[in-house]
Amino acid sequence: MYRLEYSNQFKKDFKKIIRMPISDVIEVGNVISTLQRGSQLEVKYVDHGLAGNWAGYRDCHVKPDLVLIYKIESNTLKLARIGSHSELFN
């Protein structure tokens, strides 16, 4: 099981997420738990590596326009950002 590490920006982003419907918040928790256990995400989450400024990171789509950016290094799951595509990539 990976140790969790949250970036300061992720903490700010997450404050917005907790205002979403509870089912979305639960889904975020389920995705993070799956990653923390080291299990592979279901195909529906479209997990893939990133390039450019985010090289070395991955993202997955918790919902169609709710993206989680993360990185796994040694025994740590680093949660970098969470939000819509436009918030994260524009």
Language-model-derived ranges and their functions:
Residues M1-P64, I72-K78, L88-N90:
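Basic, Lys/Arg-enriched alpha-helical interface segments
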